[in-house]
């Protein structure tokens, strides 16, 4: 998959590389966006069955090419390795569940420390910086004119994914590749653990309402709720959350960076200060 993806990327095509969280040097899939073609690893633990076999979906069965006799000779080692791997996965998921509870508690504490006013100011600052993007201003103005004339307005679409993962080699992310080629990057600096979706979700709703197709990237620790990054390719900008677990620098030669900082106040409740 790497060779296929790199082949088309070298020809200038827009290719999504879907990296594996269990093995960060391997791919689970690639997407050739303009061609509307995806190549996926359909084996466990992410089995994918064809939805329209033959008409749309094709199966590449690499099992036709393995040397069965040599693999069968290692049957005991293969089974033992899989059993150890399964046991390790169960242990890791236990640790992640505990870390998830800590993250929930930390989010509540940080909200109390920062207060609604700080969150409101950060939300307003973000909306202002989004409004400074020329493409957004022009698109919203046109949408408003069309609405005034009674024209139907279709919202934009949202692709949801992960920009990073918790891997055996530590926390990994591909943020630099996501902002590559964009004109502006809005960097939202906030304490790790803060529920940054409270700031980002209104921005995402605004952009979708304006008709922009966007990419929304979620936190692996809270994939159902915690929005962390937004990329708007057609408007040439992205919003990236920066903390000690993931940060990115805009290219000073080709990109303009806009910063918003949400800091924990120094004078807070003594109990909360201890937690900090």
Predicted regions located by residue number:
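Extended intrinsically disordered terminal tails
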Residues: 19-20, 106, 110-123, 139-142, ...
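Charged, amphipathic alpha-helical linker segments immediately N-terminal to NTP-binding catalytic cores
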Residues: 61-165, 261-263, 270
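Context-gated lysine
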Residues: 2, 33-34, 101, 129, ...
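Glycine-rich phosphate-binding P-loop
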Residues: 1-8, 169-207
């Amino acid at each position: 998959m790497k060779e296929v993806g790199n082949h088309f990327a070298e020809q200038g095509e827009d290719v999504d590389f879907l990296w594996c969280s269990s093995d960060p040097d391997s791919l689970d899939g690639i997407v050739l966006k303009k061609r509307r073609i995806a190549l996926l690893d359909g084996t466990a633990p992410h089995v994918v069955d064809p939805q329209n076999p033959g008409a749309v979906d094709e199966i590449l069965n690499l099992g036709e090419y393995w040397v069965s006799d040599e693999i069968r000779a290692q049957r005991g080692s293969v089974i033992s390795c899989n059993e150890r791997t399964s046991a390790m996965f169960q242990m890791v998921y236990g640790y992640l569940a505990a870390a998830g509870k800590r993250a929930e508690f930390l989010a509540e504490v940080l909200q109390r420390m920062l207060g609604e006013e700080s969150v409101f100011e950060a939300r307003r600052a973000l909306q202002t910086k989004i409004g400074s993007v020329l493409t957004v201003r022009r698109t919203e103005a046109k949408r408003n004119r069309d609405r005034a004339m009674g024209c139907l307005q279709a919202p934009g679409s949202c692709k949801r994914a992960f920009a990073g993962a918790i891997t055996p080699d530590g926390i990994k992310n591909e943020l630099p590749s996501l902002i590559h080629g964009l004109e502006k990057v809005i960097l939202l600096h906030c304490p790790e653990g803060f529920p940054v979706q409270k700031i980002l979700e209104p921005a995402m709703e605004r952009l979708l309402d304006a008709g922009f197709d966007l990419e929304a990237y979620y936190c692996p620790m809270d994939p159902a709720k915690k929005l962390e990054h937004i990329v708007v390719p057609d408007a040439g900008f992205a919003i990236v959350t920066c903390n000690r677990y993931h940060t990115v620098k805009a290219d000073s030669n080709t990109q303009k960076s806009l910063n918003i900082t949400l800091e924990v106040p120094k004078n807070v409740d003594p109990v909360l200060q201890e937690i900090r």
